[in-house]
Amino acid sequence: MNIHEYQAKEILSKYNVPIQPGIAILKYEDIDYAIDSLATDTFVIKAQIHAGGRKIGGGIKISNDKNEAKNLAKNMWGMNLVTPQTGPKGQKVQRIYIESAAKIKLELYLGAVIDRSNHCITFMASSEGGINIEEVAHTNPDKIIKVKINILTGIQPFHSRKIIFQLGLTGDLAKQMAKIMSAVYSMLINTDATQVEINPLIITLDDKLIALDAKINFDDSALFRQPLIQEMRDEDEEDQLELRATKADLSYVRMNGNIGCMVNGAGLAMATMDIIKLYGAEPANFLDVGGSADKERVAEALKIISSDQNVKGILINIFGGIMRCDIIAEGVLAAAKEINLSIPLVVRLAGTNFELGKEILSNSKLQIVAANDLDDAARKIVEAVS
């Protein structure tokens, strides 16, 4: 789960990470009051969306005039903000953060992630903080400092010293960085965060470290024990089909292709997407109905896939182990009739009750194409949408 910048800063502030004074605006009519309430000479107006690169897209503005700041915020509200991370479709701005400007001497980068590959928490830092950190990581990876932390021992002084030394921080700045790293580590553990980024972490003209921008991602599977974090969820920022799938307990990720996929099992789903690409087409989604789906869940999965306007055909690939193929067939028929499915549908069933499942589908009056194996299924659906 993602949250907005102002929410991330609220959490970091509770762990004593320094931030600039700011006010979140959640209603258009609160813009004037918020700007009047912020005691600063220079206003920074920030669009709040779940994507980076806002400055490039015009989502961050600076003004020394209160009235101009109000107009900038009002013009920003409701705009469709397109950044390198939103894609061409962009994201509608429905929240704004007004912040006091800081006097910057240097921009650093500091991040921490759950590093599954190395079974640890990895801190990353760089002296090249700012909007182009991704480019720095790609073109000059030596500029990214990495420190791996064993979760059994936790963060130790020597972990902080490695980053502090390589960043060239000394004196009070070194002490500030050590405190911030310790705070970020504690916050990541306590809130079930999977990623924390402070970019930039600035050094001000009076040598203070301040988190000028922040991004935090959380483990969806741990939200049941993080009610305060769950309250921060902004469903307007999420893909509505993915949100609908989450509520139906379905693993669904939307993609850019035109062939929808319904599969049981993540490995089989990956193989299905691979073979679609092998035949020259692109999958429109990853959808795993799981191993114990019932008729209603299968029907909802098909409705979600068919709700994507980019989908021109659907491939259902089921291997029945715990799941019975006749249950899949009944769910498919129920959904197809309800939504009056008009696009090509290819179904490959194997495993428990697969013959009964095929019989149910063949006895229906719907235009459903049966496939003998995965290769046959992929070929048929690609031909059908070509």
Curated annotation (Swiss-Prot):
Keywords: ATP-binding, Ligase, Magnesium, Metal-binding, Nucleotide-binding, Tricarboxylic acid cycle. GO terms for molecular function: ATP binding; magnesium ion binding; succinate-CoA ligase (ADP-forming) activity; succinate-CoA ligase (GDP-forming) activity. Disulfide bonds: none annotated. It comes from the Bacteria. GO terms for biological process: succinyl-CoA metabolic process; tricarboxylic acid cycle. Substrate binds at residues 264, 321-323. ATP binds at residues 46, 99, 102, 107. Pathway: Carbohydrate metabolism; tricarboxylic acid cycle; succinate from succinyl-CoA (ligase route): step 1/1. The keyword Metal-binding applies. Belongs to the succinate/malate CoA ligase beta subunit family. Heterotetramer of two alpha and two beta subunits. This is Succinate--CoA ligase [ADP-forming] subunit beta. It comes from Orientia tsutsugamushi (strain Ikeda) (Rickettsia tsutsugamushi). The gene is sucC.
